[in-house]
């Protein structure tokens, strides 16, 4: 089941500093980011092995997750919010604002055989 984390953020008159350390439950092997999204829905898959951490570092977006038993919706509206997606979490990302940048940290290197595109059936 996906989980929402609050990343530690330090704020002073100079601005904000958000830290990603000792909170992500895996060793990062890959980082990618999604931006310039129109009204399209991204994702639409789950994984065999990969765990992911999704952070909307600019703008906002929504993440829908279904682990085969429970459905969850996360609205990422601030850069200190992080959603951990387990391999079994079939997920889509949508409602991107025009300025949105969604950064994703992954536990595995890209492997097309790690993707499962079939969604779970109705609960």
Predicted feature descriptions by range:
Residues 1-83, 98-107, 111-120:
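Non-catalytic, conserved peripheral segments adjacent to functional cores
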């Amino acid at each position: 089941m996906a989980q929402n984390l609050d990343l530690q953020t330090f704020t002073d008159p100079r601005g904000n500093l958000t830290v990603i350390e000792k909170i992500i439950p895996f060793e990062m092997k890959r980082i990618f980011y999604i931006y310039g999204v129109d009204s399209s829905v991204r994702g639409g898959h789950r994984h065999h092995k990969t765990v992911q951490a999704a952070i909307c570092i600019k703008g906002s977006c929504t993440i829908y997750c279904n682990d085969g038993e429970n459905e969850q919706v996360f609205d990422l509206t601030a850069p200190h919010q992080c959603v951990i997606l387990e391999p079994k979490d079939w997920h889509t990302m949508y409602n991107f604002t025009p300025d949105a940048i969604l950064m994703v940290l992954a536990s595995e290197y890209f492997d097309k055989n790690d993707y499962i595109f079939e969604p779970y059936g109705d609960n």
